[in-house]
Structures are given as structure tokens and as C-alpha cells.
């Protein structure tokens, strides 16, 4: 299953950054610096945009398994923003990334990635250019229904 806390842990594993540089994107997201002169690192934002089922659920015993496509967005602001955005476009070729997603029963979609730029405000200072990458992954939800399957009546 892929949700926001799991996505954060995957990104933490991939990038190995301090917690302050990995932030969820919210509607009022600006460059999350306290000091506008803090150019030490590149800020990474993340947000799950949508979750969409694409086939019917399958029942295995008392468990229902539903395949889901999860669309999410990564944003990068700082000195390495473009470089980090470009690396996301190659994630399927990195075994560490593949393993990080596999550990949570997820897989990056190869053809569903777009990188683009977007200007964001910097709290009254000059705007910054943000690199944005939209991508998706396949995952599944497993639910224990506590019900005996209808086709297995005894």
C-alpha cells in the first residue's frame, strides 16, 4: 500500500536528507526556509494527488486485494533541483529505488512521468524556480473482510 507516510519513508531512504528538507506540499507551500539565506540544501516536497482503482478486487480467502494506481507529485527547490528532478526520470533503472518501492508492495510506472518548472514565492523575496515531477506507481490495498468467500460455502 502506498500512502503519504510510506511515500515519505521511501523518499527519505532514496535521498537520505535531513527531515527539514523533506516536506509535504500543502496549499500554502512556499519555500520552507526560516532564513532566506539558507541555501545549504535542496528542499523536496511530496504529495499524493490521486488514487484510482483500475481492475476489480480479487478475493483470496478472507482477504480482498484491490490494485490501485497512485499519482503523486515531487517538487524540488534549491541548488540541486533540476538535477534531482532529472534523476526521477531514471528511477526504474536504479535498484535502490526499485527495492524501496517493492518493500511497500509498489512499483513505479515507467511511462507516466513528467518534469516541468513552476515559479514559487519566497516570502517577499525573489521568486524561486521549482522543479516539479508528476509520476505514478502501482500498488494494492489488502483488506481482511472477515467474511467467508461466497464461492467456498461448506
Regions found by a protein language model. Give the residues of each.
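Oligomerization/assembly interface segments of phage tail-like spikes and tubes
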Residues: 64-80, 88, 127-141
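Long, highly charged amphipathic alpha-helices
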Residues: 6-10, 83, 87, 91
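Acidic-leaning, charged glycine-interspersed low-complexity segments
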Residues: 93-142
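Peripheral, non-catalytic regulatory segments
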Residues: 144-146
Amino acid at each position: 500500500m502506498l500512502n503519504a507516510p510510506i511515500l515519505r519513508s521511501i523518499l527519505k531512504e532514496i535521498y537520505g536528507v535531513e527531515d527539514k528538507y523533506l516536506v509535504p506540499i500543502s496549499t500554502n507551500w512556499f519555500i520552507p526556509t526560516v532564513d532566506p539565506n539558507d541555501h545549504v540544501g535542496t528542499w523536496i516536497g511530496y504529495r499524493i494527488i490521486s488514487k484510482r482503482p483500475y481492475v476489480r478486487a480479487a478475493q483470496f480467502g478472507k482477504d480482498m486485494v484491490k490494485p490501485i494506481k497512485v499519482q503523486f507529485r515531487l517538487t524540488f527547490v534549491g541548488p540541486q533541483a533540476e538535477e534531482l528532478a532529472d534523476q526521477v526520470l531514471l528511477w526504474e533503472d536504479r535498484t535502490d529505488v526499485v527495492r524501496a518501492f517493492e518493500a511497500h508492495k509498489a512499483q513505479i510506472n515507467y511511462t507516466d512521468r513528467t518534469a516541468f518548472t513552476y515559479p514559487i514565492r519566497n516570502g517577499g523575496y525573489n521568486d524561486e524556480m521549482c522543479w516539479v515531477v508528476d509520476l505514478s506507481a502501482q500498488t494494492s490495498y489488502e483488506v481482511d473482510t472477515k467474511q467467508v468467500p461466497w464461492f467456498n460455502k461448506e
